[in-house]
Amino acid sequence: VPPIRRDAPVKTGSTVKDGGAIFYDSHMHTPLCKHAYGEPEEYAAQGLRAGLRGIIFTCHCPMPNAFWPTVRMDEAEFDAYVAMVGKATQKFKGKLDVWLGLESEYYPGYEKYIEELHQRADFHFILGSVHWQSKEYLGKFENGTIEGFRRTYFNHLADSAESGLYDCLGHPDLVKNYHPDSWCFPILKEHVSRCLDRIAATGVAMELNTSGLNKSYHEMNPGNEFLGMMAERGIPLVIGSDAHRSARVGEHFIQALENAKAAGYKEVNYFEWRKRKALKLDAVLESLKKYEAAKAI
């Protein structure tokens, strides 16, 4: 990992005037991940159209040793990532907050690399994800039953929270897309409950990822019962579209907020300079519904 930057700029907060949009889409990508399309400015323009106050880019982090290289930026592209987000930040200053984040891999044994990576730029938000789809993960952990593999995934999700490396855990039940036809949450509920207890003890947030509606198991990540278990434990909630195309910025956010409210949540969150900021869920829902109504006129 290259050395830590020593020329960090003075940190400033939101440049958007109060009184309008209030919420942030906290998960989206850039073409550097090799499977997303459109420049950051296009995502920002869609953020304005979606009635958001800001967006946070969380492109897939670089990894050493050619770890699943087809879905992430190369290590040599990291500075270009920081620069391209920074360019959009300046272009939309005063209109929409465009902030730098990172979707960081959790894979046992790479913690030191990830810790050092997080020091290379001034991030607003670090989203930790366990990606069971990688050949590395499948090769090491797919060595028993389907349910056993899923339990291993949830163990790693809790491990990632306990590592202290991440602000929030991304798409927490992503593993339901592993043999989706056999997914049965009640079978795993007790195990998930224990893992959520571990996560709740850390104070780390968890994401409600709306892109699950576009995956093989057609449901947000997590599903509603899982979401309710998070709410019962007081686990802070962040919402992200996981947009890989600009048109999906802010997609399904009203439905996501309604799901969260039904699950028992009263607040939703975003991160600024890696500090969690809470908003009243009803206020966020009202702001987005008003914006949708105004567009329809």
Regions found by a protein language model. Name each.
Residues 68-202, 283-297:
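Extended substrate/RNA-proximal surfaces in nucleic-acid metabolism proteins
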Residues 24-28, 55-57, 98-102, 126-128, ...:
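Hydrophobic faces of well-ordered beta-strands that scaffold small-molecule active sites
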Residues 44, 48, 119, 161-162, ...:
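Non-catalytic positions within long, well-ordered alpha-helices that form the structural scaffold/packing
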Residues 60, 131, 174-177, 211, ...:
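Flexible loop residues that form catalytic
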